[in-house]
């Protein structure tokens, strides 16, 4: 990649994160490697964390337009799609800019043969109406709309069926969430232990 490329840095970090974990360490290393500063550094970081925060939703939408699924794609192409869709849906980046830059990234990562697929999938995915989605059950709905793992979605559905989606979406928006333990189902301490085990809270 020649010159500052915050989108490319975000995609490269996402590829490594999916393979190795430790998101903050990987992102910091990629930002240093590409010598990104100021707005470029902030933009790359925003893309990276927006993808991680909304990955369940992003993957569901993209999968509607990928008959063979996301898992069959090259890692770089998969992350290019996620990053572009995240920009258009959650970061107020114009759809045309998100798509055009994603197509450019296929060349940057030597995946030019995927440029047509990236262009076609994104143009449809960006306009996808989640409100029209039909889910198998409430757990799948929570997983997609709340971008939650299955264990988290099951736990919240069982213990907080009326509040589960609000809990997930408010947490994603950075708001504060208060929970009250149901004394008929357990103690506050037991609830805290379960939430810690599911990485829903941190102490």
Question: Which residues are covered by each model-predicted region?
Answer:
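Class I Rossmann-like S-adenosyl-L-methionine
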Residues: 1-200
């Amino acid at each position: 990649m020649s010159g500052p490329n915050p989108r490319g840095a975000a995609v490269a970090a996402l590829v490594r994160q999916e393979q190795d974990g430790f998101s903050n360490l990987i992102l910091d290393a990629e930002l240093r490697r590409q010598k990104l500063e100021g707005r470029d550094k902030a933009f790359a970081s925003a893309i990276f964390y927006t993808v991680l925060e909304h990955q369940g939703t992003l993957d569901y939408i993209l999968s509607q337009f990928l008959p063979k699924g996301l898992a069959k794609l090259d890692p770089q192409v998969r992350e290019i799609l996620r990053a572009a869709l995240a920009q258009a849906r959650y970061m107020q980046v114009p759809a045309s800019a998100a798509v055009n830059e994603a197509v450019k990234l296929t060349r940057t990562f030597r995946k030019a043969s995927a440029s047509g697929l990236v262009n076609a999938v994104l143009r449809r995915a960006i306009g996808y109406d989640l409100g029209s989605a039909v889910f198998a059950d409430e757990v799948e709905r929570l997983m997609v709309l709340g971008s939650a793992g299955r264990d988290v979605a099951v736990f919240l559905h069982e213990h907080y069926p009326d509040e589960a989606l609000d809990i997930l979406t408010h947490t994603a928006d950075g708001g504060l969430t208060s929970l009250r333990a149901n004394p008929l189902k357990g103690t506050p301490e037991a609830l805290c232990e379960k939430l810690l085990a599911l990485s829903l809270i941190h102490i």
